[in-house]
């Protein structure tokens, strides 16, 4: 843009000329006079009244001067201009520091993203700049493509050169290497400055002395190891610092005071004192300390400084430090008119509050917070100072910056006191006052030296860290390696670090860069600044990019100088030198150098734009967060306001509630007073009534005592009468018991005699039966042998032929009359034997042979041994307690009685080679009336009547397939019906093997598959037709009982062989359709070893509970009568409105009258009623029965046995001997008869 006025152009031209002259020779820019601070007079007492003509001032060195007060307008204008310039510089410095702080706040990943610059991005920056800032020359105006091609060629050439040096170079590393060159050039300038300052040291020490000291220092370092290593590295620097301070500081003490001090102490003692102080403060090396003492004695300034440190605790030295910092700032501002980032940083040192406000997000700190910050910085710097190395360690850049600003700020005195107090607190115990003062001086000198030597050192560490961060990023991505060639530059003597990437962020265009000497130059001003303010856009201004092919140097003037334009003379000569510029060619090296610088500027501009974009983005986030916080604060205030109102309302409500409570309390007190008065009246009335009541009760008591006395006399008389009556009854009872005992004794004797007679009769019958059976067996054996001969001769293996069936049938018909006669005789003998005798007998005893009747040895040797002996009890185990001889007789008798039937069936079955098939249910492996069949396997031949016990025991454990037997009364094969004689034979065999009775489900508590053939095995019954009672019988544990399959169809049960209520015999058609099966080997059941034993338990897996069976029931009450009585009692006491209510078991037991049952027997009877009476129980947690319920229906009637029909008409004249029924007039002990009569 064109300049605003001619005066400004002239001003800019003069500034440009000054910059050229100032930067032409860096060594000449250092003026020795600048080392001496300028004396600026100031008012000693600003509030005092001074004469208008003059004013007394104090110089920095302590001298008093008198000057007139300047009141002219020129001075005011100059002051205003200086103030304006200072504000502009402060604002620019504040912005620079803000950007630096923003860079430090970025994460490593964000820094890497910003530093990652691609090739296309660099060229885009150059193209965009050319579009915005095009010159008026022929080449630039035409925007020829050759410029872009030339820049790309130069870029590729430079990249290839770096690639040759470092094969691992990539575009990103190449860009960072170009930027690194700016950092190297800056370090070179600092090295030049250090070498210039080194001349001062040479003036202080001779060259030979310096060389010898260096050798001694190197030798001494090897001995002192790590503790003295850092101190020796800083020895030369400390010496230089002291010399520099001596040249810039005026001591406050006058020469007279110094001479007085010297006169007070002898030279020798003073020198020794100085030597000790030097060894402590300067260096512990003896030669260095001695050299320092000698120089100190030669130069009064050094001596005065040392005395101040030793005597006044360094107060004068502190003032000197402040003056040095101030003078250093003034010197830095005078070195160059162009204000760089270094100067901006140094001029910003006087603004600690503004700096802390910026760090606090624009919010000023309070006085307390500011004081706390100063105290923390003072303590932190005190703790970080190392007395051995005389340097600060582990101090962050921010803490260093704050320390420098506080030391040069407006409140420097208070901060200085904090520093002194902190140092005293830490080192007072370790060091003396002189050493403490020396330590303070060394601390401040170290800090000031770093500030004076490099005004940009507050950023150096962070810059190096930034570059290191990117190096780490490059190593991780395997794209960038170490820049060995770039980092090989020598570092300064003080070991100062390089400026890093941040130096490029503030780079405008290097002032040391020499413009080429050719006639055509284009100066394009890129920004015009307002004189009133400096914005961020002015700070991050567009950098002038030189058009390399045409030698156009587009340079941006200094950012902080305001509006600066090119000189008019150069603008006027633009058109004359265009062609000459193109013709004046440069060699390839100059082209590459110019291209590298152009790329440097483009990368710098790109980094600046990225930093600004990141900064603005972060500011936007901060503003957004701040807005959210403000909104949250408003909500919080609103919520607090609402809560306050709510509390106020609650307080009012509480107040009203308390008032209401007070009113209620007052009302309650009035009511209590009324109640108290009322109670007093009632109490008086009660006392009066109580006195009256006592009088009445006294009279009544006397009457009661009289009446009680009469009753007691009458009671005594009645008791005497009752006692006499009981004595008479006791005598009567004893007489009756004696009579009863005599009768019982007689009855027992009669029973004993009766049993002896019965035993003799039974033995006789058994002997006869044995002889008859022996004959029948011999005849049958001979017949079988004869019948088997034809088959043997013809080669047929079946020993029994179907042709022998007619012979067997004839044999059966011939012997049927004799067998029937014997059975009738047996039954009549039982019915007619002593009906009035009280002794009991057992029908089964009549059918058992004597145990002493054994087969002769000869007959046993001639009997054939059966090939397949089946166990009569299936898989049952017969214990040794059973009388095997009796069982052998039982087996022989069964074989004899069933011979005529089983022989034919067996021959037919064996002929057809039939395997064991389904059999009828057999509860215990024996024949029963409920099963209607005998499942015992009968061999074709008759067994011997008596079998040895050992042989029976061995056969009891054998098992073999059983031959299928036809059901009782069923024809074999469905074509032949047995005669009545055959049925009687089968029934007789069943009767002799199993017993006379079977118990139905209504009279036992067990399932049909487990009922005993002797009815209830633990109960004995008495009937009217018996002559005595049976003994209690039970099944002992260990006896296995044959189970019944669940699929077997149950048949009608019979309770007595005399009962005539059974259903008619099934005809052929009904039974032929049924599949009645039973297998002895299905599952185990328990059977008693002795069916006559008592007081044992059933051990069957089918039992629902292990309840002991009832003991003996008193004679005269049979099973069905007991069960009916229990059921009727339940119906009587149960409520009628309920269908089937539960009744307590104790209530039912107490209402049973006349049965004489104990509780355990009662429970057993209830269990036996489950099936027939639909009885249900309710138990508690322990399993005990507590309640019982019966269905309201008629219990199932007891089935009548078939023998009841057979013997129902024994006394009928028209009946046959097998259709008559015996009668008796006395009670019998048959468990199967309810009530029968018998006639003689």
Curated annotation (Swiss-Prot):
- List every position bearing Phosphoserine: 266
Enumerate the residue ranges of region (Disordered): 1-76, 446-593, 634-744, 951-980, 998-1029, 1214-1240
Keyword Phosphoprotein carried by entry: yes
The reply on keyword Phosphoprotein is: yes
Q: Which InterPro entries match?
A: Fungal_stress_NST1 (IPR051195), NST1 (IPR025279)
Q: Tell me the superkingdom of the source.
A: Eukaryota
Where is this protein localized, as stated in its record?
Answer: Cytoplasm
Q: Where is the composition biased (Basic residues)?
A: 1-20, 514-524
Basic and acidic residues: bias regions: 39-48, 488-513
Miscellaneous comment: Present with 217 molecules/cell in log phase SD medium.
**PANTHER family reported in the protein's UniProt record:** LD36051P (PTHR31780:SF10), STRESS RESPONSE PROTEIN NST1-RELATED (PTHR31780)
What functional role does this protein have? With MSL1, acts as a negative regulator of salt tolerance.
What protein name is recorded for this chain?
A: Stress response protein NST1
* Gene, per the UniProt record: NST1
